[in-house]
């Protein structure tokens, strides 16, 4: 069972955004969380969900304006964030949440800008432009996949641009500001995925309900994804990416014809990605990709013990 800790005696700065909580999930990323907190503390209350039950992190959180939740195990991106989101909405009575990855670089002013735009538009899910370490955008939109799905009616047309927001089919999972009304309308993140593709599936569900999603063109954030992943870590990611793409069919679409169309297109997209692996000589990822696709079609969910 999750364990929650919060020191109600701490003094919260008056400049905090009272209707917003920042959700961060920890899995062996304590130092990243401390660094992120040092940059943006005081802008909104923090909710840290600990998927690795770190006694060090728990002790550190008790000395600051941070709500600490021990999740009791590794529940992945979706499970951990859902705990934090539910706590923020139900216990803290927040109207919006900001889901952040621990390895994200963003400052207080940018969070305030996101919040101001979020509150003043009819976009219920927004994210900044996400850059890699070299300053190259990694969440450019519209994506070929989203364009393809919209062309055959699996997703509605994108709305018009509003203020500094570019309409997109999905936000980047490392930084998403989401209104409470979204969860009331479509539910929470899909916990059957464990990791990867969950923000895309969540946003596709939102888009199917005509919920607007935007990328803020005046706010940038840097996602410090590791460049030294082991072969196993990369293969694990490939497996989950391919598997969860197919798992998304049942949760996004209620009509069988839509599921068939989505699955057919996903097979074509996956095949194209495997061909790219061949050309790029990434042979070691082909087996995880194929097994991931097969297991997704077979509806195998949750955290895989091995590929």
Curated annotation (Swiss-Prot):
<dbReference type="Pfam" id="PF00535">
    <property type="entry name" value="Glycos_transf_2"/>
</dbReference>
<protein>
    <recommendedName>
        <fullName>Low-salt glycan biosynthesis hexosyltransferase Agl10</fullName>
        <ecNumber>2.4.1.-</ecNumber>
    </recommendedName>
</protein>
<keyword id="KW-0808">Transferase</keyword>
<comment type="similarity">
    <text>Belongs to the glycosyltransferase 2 family.</text>
</comment>
<dbReference type="GO" id="GO:0016757">
    <property type="term" value="F:glycosyltransferase activity"/>
</dbReference>
<comment type="pathway">
    <text>Protein modification; protein glycosylation.</text>
</comment>
<dbReference type="GO" id="GO:0045232">
    <property type="term" value="P:S-layer organization"/>
</dbReference>
<comment type="function">
    <text>Hexosyltransferase involved in N-glycan biosynthetic pathway that takes place under low-salt conditions (1.75 M instead of 3.4 M). Participates in the formation of the tetrasaccharide present at 'Asn-532' of S-layer glycoprotein Csg, consisting of a sulfated hexose, 2 hexoses and rhamnose. Involved in the addition of final rhamnose (sugar 4) of the tetrasaccharide on the dolichol phosphate carrier.</text>
</comment>
<dbReference type="InterPro" id="IPR001173">
    <property type="entry name" value="Glyco_trans_2-like"/>
</dbReference>
<keyword id="KW-0328">Glycosyltransferase</keyword>
<dbReference type="InterPro" id="IPR029044">
    <property type="entry name" value="Nucleotide-diphossugar_trans"/>
</dbReference>
<dbReference type="GO" id="GO:0006486">
    <property type="term" value="P:protein glycosylation"/>
</dbReference>
<comment type="pathway">
    <text>Cell surface structure biogenesis; S-layer biogenesis.</text>
</comment>
